[in-house]
């Protein structure tokens, strides 16, 4: 089946969640009934919003409702894995809705693939990024006291169909992370491409690079199956 790229640009979180849920349900149903379907890779940005995953702890949000309103942010409890994270303008969010069985991927391998795609995007800007043991996502200097996260990852999978995905800080206002314990960590920082490069990075350029790396990695999986 084919995989198509969809760009929603700036979209409210609630609308994006509803639309990806509908597409997710459609793919699950089509797969179960043996019907044709499309894999989709959605890219977008959101207005200021915090999302708390199934395993998240309420005390990792440091603001009350009135304080959230004051910074023009909202909070959603959602059905992905992971703890609390922030989405906002200048952050590239990617929601792949994929049939993992088509690529012979398990959930752990899939998360590893998402991390690898972001690591390669960072490398294309001269930034050395990697993984941190027992901590999903992409990190800089992960094994040092200066460890800082540049990309959060949280997914949901049912019948080997995925939704939710990754959030890569490009030109993100990092002050919004100070209102939470990002992903439940209290001793690690966050960063962005702009923070590391000391200049704005064109969002369309980053989208193109991420699309390229995801496509390359998924195609490699398909080629391995064919061999």
From Swiss-Prot:
<feature type="binding site">
    <location>
        <begin position="152"/>
        <end position="154"/>
    </location>
    <ligand>
        <name>substrate</name>
    </ligand>
</feature>
<comment type="pathway">
    <text>Protein modification; protein lipoylation via endogenous pathway; protein N(6)-(lipoyl)lysine from octanoyl-[acyl-carrier-protein]: step 1/2.</text>
</comment>
<keyword id="KW-0012">Acyltransferase</keyword>
<dbReference type="GO" id="GO:0033819">
    <property type="term" value="F:lipoyl(octanoyl) transferase activity"/>
</dbReference>
<dbReference type="InterPro" id="IPR000544">
    <property type="entry name" value="Octanoyltransferase"/>
</dbReference>
<dbReference type="GO" id="GO:0036211">
    <property type="term" value="P:protein modification process"/>
</dbReference>
<dbReference type="InterPro" id="IPR045864">
    <property type="entry name" value="aa-tRNA-synth_II/BPL/LPL"/>
</dbReference>
<comment type="function">
    <text>Catalyzes the transfer of endogenously produced octanoic acid from octanoyl-acyl-carrier-protein onto the lipoyl domains of lipoate-dependent enzymes. Lipoyl-ACP can also act as a substrate although octanoyl-ACP is likely to be the physiological substrate.</text>
</comment>
<dbReference type="InterPro" id="IPR020605">
    <property type="entry name" value="Octanoyltransferase_CS"/>
</dbReference>
<comment type="similarity">
    <text>Belongs to the LipB family.</text>
</comment>
<protein>
    <recommendedName>
        <fullName>Octanoyltransferase</fullName>
        <ecNumber>2.3.1.181</ecNumber>
    </recommendedName>
</protein>
<feature type="site" description="Lowers pKa of active site Cys">
    <location>
        <position position="149"/>
    </location>
</feature>
<dbReference type="Pfam" id="PF21948">
    <property type="entry name" value="LplA-B_cat"/>
</dbReference>
<feature type="binding site">
    <location>
        <begin position="165"/>
        <end position="167"/>
    </location>
    <ligand>
        <name>substrate</name>
    </ligand>
</feature>
<keyword id="KW-0963">Cytoplasm</keyword>
<feature type="active site" description="Acyl-thioester intermediate">
    <location>
        <position position="183"/>
    </location>
</feature>
<keyword id="KW-0808">Transferase</keyword>
<dbReference type="InterPro" id="IPR004143">
    <property type="entry name" value="BPL_LPL_catalytic"/>
</dbReference>
<feature type="domain" description="BPL/LPL catalytic">
    <location>
        <begin position="35"/>
        <end position="222"/>
    </location>
</feature>
<dbReference type="GO" id="GO:0005737">
    <property type="term" value="C:cytoplasm"/>
</dbReference>
<feature type="binding site">
    <location>
        <begin position="80"/>
        <end position="87"/>
    </location>
    <ligand>
        <name>substrate</name>
    </ligand>
</feature>
